[in-house]
From Swiss-Prot:
Belongs to the glycosyl hydrolase 19 family. Chitinase class I subfamily. Pfam families: Glyco_hydro_19 (PF00182). GO terms for biological process: cell wall macromolecule catabolic process; chitin catabolic process; defense response; polysaccharide catabolic process. Defense against chitin-containing fungal and bacterial pathogens. This is Endochitinase 4.
């Protein structure tokens, strides 16, 4: 439920409270399941 480092909160992503920054958009990060997977796995598996 709490953001950690450069990762947003899963709760914020699920509830549409998270809005991607210009850096997020440039990296292809958009609200949805893929971002949640990267948050949980730390981006190691994706």
């Amino acid at each position: 439920m709490t953001p950690q480092g450069n990762k947003p909160s899963c709760h914020d992503v699920i509830t549409n409270a998270w809005r991607p920054t210009a850096t997020d958009s440039a990296a292809g990060r958009a609200p949805g399941y893929g971002v949640i997977t990267n948050i949980i796995n730390g981006g190691l598996d994706c």
